[in-house]
A protein has these predicted regions:
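Patatin-like phospholipase
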Residues: 1-204
Length: 204
């Protein structure tokens, strides 16, 4: 998995095409001589790329899940194919939880270092250890796209104007709901560091 960052790399149309090159519908796109496919086939929510970025700073992170894995039990082979794709591209809650634990350890190190006597805190070896601490707060806003109409297992290659417009609108409305709730203003435990925010499902 390779992350391209506009702060370090010069991004071109090839990078955009590679980020949407889902096999087998699209071939890999070559960048610097290497073939790349959509990173979603490996990790659809690589939150570690944000939490490990240096210099680390408090952030509001929008984690977007395009396909909703919740729903009824599959009743046919086509339903199974649909569910398989939803699971494949779902955000990994275990991955987010792992990053939450790691960031909590950074906060614990920082809190412990604040309670050290000055003469101990000044020791070079202690300063080196204290540098692993961090006091940033990361608000992860989980956006899950609602199901749209009669979508099936081919929805990831549906580039019709109707399909694209429907997903744009659904995503816009979900983002508006999240922004209106302003969860990043909520207080976070000093030890935690990572707060995961979700929205209740819409009832229609």
């Amino acid at each position: 998995m390779r992350y391209f960052d506009s702060s370090r790399d010069t991004l071109t149309a090839d990078h955009v095409m590679a980020s949407a090159a889902l096999p087998p519908a699209f071939p890999a796109v070559r960048i610097d001589g290497e073939p790349y496919w959509d990173g979603g086939i490996y990790s659809n929510t690589p939150i570690e790329a944000v939490l490990d970025d240096e210099p680390r700073r408090s952030s509001v992170i929008f984690s977007v899940q395009v396909w909703n894995p919740d729903g009824p039990e599959p009743q046919s082979v086509l339903d199974v194919l649909d569910k398989q794709k939803e699971i494949q591209y779902a955000s990994r809650s275990s991955q987010i939880e792992q990053q939450r634990k790691l960031h909590r350890l950074r906060h614990v190190i920082r809190e412990l270092s604040l309670h050290l006597p000055p003469e101990i805190a000044a020791l070079p070896e202690v300063r080196d250890l204290s540098c692993w601490g961090c006091g940033t707060t990361m608000h992860v806003l989980s956006l899950v796209a609602p199901r749209i109409g009669d979508e099936d297992h081919t929805k990831d290659i549906d580039f019709s104007s109707i399909g694209i417009s429907a997903r744009w609108q659904a995503g816009y409305e979900e983002a508006q709901r999240m922004i209106a709730s302003r969860p990043w203003e909520s207080k976070v435990d000093v030890i935690e560091g990572v707060a995961l925010h979700t929205l209740p499902p819409l009832v229609k």
